């Protein structure tokens, strides 16, 4: 069974939560390949250096600076979104024709399905939340999303089936795929297989682990014709132990760099521009004023991995999965955006979280508010982030609820494998 996994490129969260999905398909004996863009290619290459990557079209989304513009922005850009979706669907059909995929797995890529492959769509946002001023659009959003779901063979929801789970009303109400199957597959975190006793500080097999060199995808993919895109991308693929490893090039793991025993704050910068850079600047200014040692992870997996220190802040362009987990474990508090993939990761690691939702991403605002209300995390609006508000947050006693061992994802993958075998008979 040949599977192509394609996460949406609105930030890195969709890529990180695909990690356990890829692992489970590999355990089931599937041949897995990855549809990547420039922003997530290096991340996947570090986690799955042995898997072939194929260049996929990018949605090229830039969020507005101010949250109150988001609903109007969505309407304004609906024609662009529809153009990308039409193109994406043609691309998916072409990939099945050229490479013979049996299963297409789409993490929130709205049109990544094919009539000639079993197509799975994953989303935690059955309900697309809008600010109160634009609540009238919410019903339209639900109807639109339901129409998207019905074009796939199966829909997966990365949450617990029993309300409220971790995403609350976002995952437990709203769109349904009609008569198509919909399965809750549990929380999905790239850290679900991380074991502190065996893997802490071991980026890719050793304390001085190899980290693949940056992948150059030449440029972001524009809306070119399908034939042009396929001609451009047909041979853009990478395989595991190739020339980079042979060259002997190494990047040192965090222990070799002298990782500190503890950090007051580990700040994780993520998301799309321009909000990502604004968040980075806010955190720099705030942490410089707060006593103690801090770490900032800049969330730039497409950049060369670098580490440096400025004052009381240790900077990393990005970290391998196990190094990231170790850093979070050593932090008194983690400050990050409140995307759902981050919520699942922090719950898996048992972190004390301060969430600063991305302006305009109302989903993050809803999640952060609900988690704060439940006593699981602290919420700080982006326009209020400062050394003073962080100091107040440090006084609060919060911790993400523990993630219990689940077999929901395993069962979902086994069900797909069983369907494939039945079709093949």
For each predicted feature, which ranges?
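Active-site-proximal region of nucleotide-activated glycan assembly enzymes
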Residues: 51, 115-185, 190, 209, ...
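Short amphipathic alpha-helix
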Residues: 15-25, 40
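A short, glycine/small-residue-rich beta-strand->loop->alpha-helix junction that serves as a flexible
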Residues: 7-19, 274-277
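Conserved nucleotide-sugar phosphate-binding/catalytic loop shared by glycosyltransferases and other
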Residues: 9, 27-78, 241, 314
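C-terminal amphipathic helix plus adjacent low-complexity
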Residues: 207, 221, 226-230, 392-425
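A donor-sugar binding/catalytic signature common to diverse glycosyltransferases
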Residues: 323-366
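Conserved nucleotide-sugar donor-binding subdomain of glycosyltransferases
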Residues: 69-111
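Donor-nucleotide binding loops and adjacent catalytic segments primarily
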Residues: 190-242, 247-333
């Amino acid at each position: 069974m040949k599977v192509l996994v394609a996460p949406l490129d609105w930030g890195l969260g969709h890529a990180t939560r695909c990690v356990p999905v890829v692992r489970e398909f590999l355990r089931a004996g599937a041949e897995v390949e990855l549809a990547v863009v420039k922003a997530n290619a290096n991340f996947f290459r570090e986690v799955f250096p042995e898997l072939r990557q194929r260049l996929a079209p990018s949605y090229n989304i830039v969020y507005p600076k101010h949250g109150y513009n988001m609903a109007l922005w969505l309407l304004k850009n609906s024609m662009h979104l529809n153009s990308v979706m039409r193109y994406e669907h043609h691309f998916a059909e072409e990939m099945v024709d050229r490479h013979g995929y049996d299963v297409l797995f789409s993490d929130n890529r709205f049109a990544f399905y094919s009539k000639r492959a079993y197509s799975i769509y994953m989303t935690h946002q059955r309900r697309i939340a809008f600010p109160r001023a634009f609540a009238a659009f919410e019903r339209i959003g639900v109807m639109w999303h339901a129409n998207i779901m019905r074009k796939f063979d199966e829909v997966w929801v990365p949450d617990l089936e029993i309300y409220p789970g971790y995403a609350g009303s976002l995952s437990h109400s709203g769109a349904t795929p009609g008569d198509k199957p919909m399965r809750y597959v549990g929380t999905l975190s790239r850290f679900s297989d991380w074991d502190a006793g065996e893997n802490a500080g071991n980026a890719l097999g050793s304390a001085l682990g190899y980290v693949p060199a940056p992948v150059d995808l030449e440029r972001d993919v524009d809306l070119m014709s399908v034939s042009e895109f396929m001609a451009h991308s047909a041979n853009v693929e990478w395989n595991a132990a190739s020339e980079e490893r042979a060259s002997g090039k190494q990047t040192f793991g965090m222990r070799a760099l002298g990782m500190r025993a503890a950090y007051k704050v580990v700040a994780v910068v993520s998301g799309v521009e321009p909000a990502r850079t604004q968040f980075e600047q806010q955190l720099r200014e705030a942490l410089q004023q707060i006593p103690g040692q801090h770490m900032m992870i800049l969330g730039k997996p497409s950049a060369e991995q670098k580490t440096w220190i400025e004052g009381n802040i240790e900077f990393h362009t990005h970290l391998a999965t196990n190094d990231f987990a170790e850093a979070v474990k050593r932090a008194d508090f983690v400050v990050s955006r409140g995307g759902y993939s981050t919520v699942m990761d922090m719950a898996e690691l048992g972190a004390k979280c301060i969430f600063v939702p991305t302006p305009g991403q109302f989903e993050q605002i809803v999640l952060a508010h609900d988690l704060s209300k439940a006593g699981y995390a602290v919420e700080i609006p982006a326009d209020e982030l400062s050394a003073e508000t962080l100091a107040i947050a440090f006084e609060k006693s919060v911790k993400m609820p523990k993630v219990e061992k689940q077999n929901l994802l395993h069962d979902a993958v086994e069900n797909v494998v069983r369907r494939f075998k039945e079709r093949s008979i």
